[in-house]
C-alpha cells in the first residue's frame, strides 16, 4: 500500500510550534493549494490542507516559515479522532510532513509580488532544459555491454 502526498502551496498564516509532554517539538500550519482546474467563474478553487511537522523539521519550519511563503511538502495523510472537554468527538485529516522545501528565497519573500515570483521560478526551471535537443527521447543506447558497471 502507498500513502504519499506531494503538495505545493502557500502558508495561510504563520506556523505554530508546541511541545508534547515529552518535550518533542511539533509545528502545524495550513497550506493553500490550488486545484488543477478553472471553475466556471474563471478561478481555481483552493483547498486548505493542515500540515504537521515533528522534531527537527518542526523547529526548522517554525523558525523559517511565515504566512504567504511558497513551499513544497512531501508526506503522508493521517486521520485521527479526539474528544473535546464536552465529550464531542472530532475527526481530523492532515498531512504529516517528511520534508518541507522552501521554494523562494527568504530575502525576496514578502515583497507582495507572489505571482511574479512564481513566474520567475517557472522560468528558472524551464532554463534547466534549454540545452536538451527537441528530438531527444530520453534514451541513449549502449553500444557494448562491456560499458555496464555491473
Swiss-Prot record:
Domain of life: Bacteria
Gene Ontology molecular-function annotations: single-stranded DNA binding
Keywords associated with the record: DNA damage, DNA recombination, DNA repair, DNA replication, DNA-binding
Residue ranges of the motif Important for interaction with partner proteins: 145-150
GO BP, sorted A to Z: DNA recombination; DNA repair; DNA replication
Assembly behavior: Homotetramer.
NCBIfam families, A to Z: ssb
Biological role: Plays an important role in DNA replication, recombination and repair. Binds to ssDNA and to an array of partner proteins to recruit them to their sites of action during DNA metabolism.
Protein name (record): Single-stranded DNA-binding protein
Record organism: Caldanaerobacter subterraneus subsp. tengcongensis (strain DSM 15242 / JCM 11007 / NBRC 100824 / MB4)
Gene: ssb
